[in-house]
Amino acid sequence: AALEKVAIKCSVENLADKTDITLPGTLFNRALKVEQKIAEGDAVRIRLGYDRILRDEFSGYVSEIATDNDSVRIHCEDELYKFRKDLKDRVLKSVTVKTLLTSVAEEVGKYEVACDYDFTYDNFTIHAATGYDVLRKVQSETKANIYLRGKTLHVHPQYAQIGEKVIYDFAVNIEKSDLKYRDASKRKFLAVVEGTDAKGKTIRIERGTT
């Protein structure tokens, strides 16, 4: 087997889910000529599991191939890789975030847009940028969850979309714990939540005591 390591990074805080595939630089004393068989933009699907029971863990595209000492690293991104296309330079005035993203999605690849935000930019300049750059700017300013599902670009506030429930089991998926019993009257808890609403306003809520 020529595979050294696979690292999958999935987080709503990142614009795109990413995977690094590490291969040895040589195999049986021969250099692996990866660039002759794999190219940027090639589709990638990763399936992992046990006892030949596999499930899909990642699908996307090769974004970069690099050498790292004696290894070859293949960097991959999920479907949002398709937005790494150059856009026409332009300045959009009094444009809502949904109209902006609809314009970008249309130019990149005829994508639909499902967006919960309705605030307006006075001016939004696109210069020497890709569709991915625009998505990253919008995410950095709104903290939105942005992802592709089929031909629809989704843009939603954090926690607006609830995924599957996860069950944590000490015998199954908890590697380490440091739990301590405390009397209810002595437990102090302070929760601070910050977010951006659909109109672009920053909201901060504190609950609890320290």
Region spans (language model):
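Short beta-strands and strand-coil junctions in structured, solvent-facing domains, enriched
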Residues: 28-29, 82, 143-145, 162, ...
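Hydrophobic residues embedded in beta-strands of well-ordered beta-sheets
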Residues: 72, 152-154
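Short, well-structured beta-strand/strand-turn elements
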Residues: 109-116, 142-152
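A structural detector for beta-sheet-dominated domains
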Residues: 9-11, 22-24, 47-49, 77, ...
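Short acidic/polar beta-strand-loop edge motifs in secreted extracellular
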Residues: 82-103, 113-137, 141
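Short, charged, solvent-exposed linker or helix-capping segments at domain edges/interfaces
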Residues: 33, 85-89, 165-168
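Assembly/oligomerization scaffold segments
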Residues: 1-82
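Acidic, small/polar-enriched beta strand-loop surface segments
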Residues: 136, 148-150, 157-210
